[in-house]
Design a protein with these regions (language model features):
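Binuclear metal-dependent hydrolase catalytic cores centered on His/Asp/Glu-rich metal-binding motifs
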Residues: 134, 138-141, 147-148, 154-193, ...
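Catalytic metal-binding/acid-base residues of hydrolase active sites
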Residues: 57, 89, 123-124, 148-149, ...
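Short, conserved loop/helix-junction motifs that constitute active-site signature segments
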Residues: 77, 107-113, 181-185, 203-206
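Conserved beta-sheet core of the metallophosphoesterase superfamily
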Residues: 196-267
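N-terminal membrane-anchoring alpha-helices
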Residues: 1-44
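Active-site-proximal beta-strand elements of phosphoester/diester hydrolases
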Residues: 47-57, 157-167, 190-194, 248-256
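Membrane-embedded segments
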Residues: 44-142
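Short, Asp-centered acidic motifs that coordinate Mg2+ and/or phosphate
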Residues: 80-81, 117, 141-142, 159, ...
Length: 267
């Protein structure tokens, strides 16, 4: 009888842990702020605010109501640049025109002085790729697929922003993405790549100042003190919030920021 009681207690504990991990631990919205210093940034960009979020997987934990909360929180920060680093929809989600319109409308309401940028994640290639691209277009997010943009403010000072295609299911091309930096390496540079472990490949090819990633969910299965028990492929080495690599910055985001500084906010 005592043995049966013990088994029942263990089973109930496991069920409660699963419920907590699936529905409670994933429901809170936490904003983390980092200040990044660089003497490569022109003075006119002092205090630049970047909001970085990733891996919404809309349709699983994230609902329309939840997305509105995230959008409202982003707009409260009044960001200069907004960056989303892939995996927009849950791969099991069945999409239609109404859903595309709903998500597009919410993401379009995000305001950013210098623009909104995104890249593709591995789940974006598995299902709903065309719908995801349509959402980005409708919501005024610039999709950087082995491409880059040069942000220029009213003082004509520049920041380079490049986005690399997904490294697991896409066709990443570091050379074409970073071609501008070969002749302009004094420009402050930001690279977006969904899988953080690919940062090593990027830095072997080209020196950059800041890399923003997603994918790892800060350790997919994680126990306090012990740390991550499981991380997805592409985030085995780098899965925490912030790393310094060769004096460069790698900031990865879990789904859910007198040298010049950038303030980066993570969700």
């Amino acid at each position: 009888m005592k043995k049966i009681k013990t088994i029942i207690i263990i089973l109930i504990s496991i069920i409660l842990i699963i419920i907590y991990a699936r529905f409670i631990a994933t429901s809170g919205l936490i904003t983390k702020e980092y200040t990044i210093y660089s003497d490569k940034l022109p003075y006119s960009y002092n205090g630049l605010k970047i909001v970085h979020f990733s891996d919404l997987h809309y349709g699983s934990v994230i609902t329309s109501k939840r997305l509105k909360q995230i959008v409202d929180e982003i707009n409260l920060i009044n960001p200069d640049i907004v960056i989303f680093t892939g995996d927009l929809l849950d791969k099991s989600l069945k999409t239609d025109d109404k859903l595309v319109e709903t998500i597009s409308k919410q993401l379009k309401s995000i305001s950013a002085k210098y623009g909104k940028y995104t890249i593709m994640g591995n789940h974006d290639y598995e299902e709903n790729k065309s719908e995801i691209e349509k959402i980005y277009k409708n919501s005024n997010f610039t999709l950087l697929n082995n491409q880059y943009d040069i942000i220029i403010n009213k003082e004509k000072d520049k920041i380079y922003l490049g986005g690399i295609d997904d490294t697991l299911l896409g066709n990443p091309d570091i050379k074409s993405t970073t071609s501008y930096l070969k002749e302009n390496n004094d420009t402050y540079s930001i690279i977006l790549v969904h899988e953080p472990d690919y940062s090593t490949n990027i830095l072997k090819e080209q020196e950059v100042d800041l890399i923003l990633s997603g994918h790892s969910h800060n350790g997919q299965v994680r126990i306090p003190i012990i740390g991550a028990l499981y991380t997805p492929n592409g985030s085995k080495k780098y899965y925490k919030n912030h790393y310094k690599i060769f004096q460069n910055e790698l900031n990865r985001c879990s789904c859910i920021f007198p040298l010049i500084s950038i303030h980066i906010f993570f969700f």
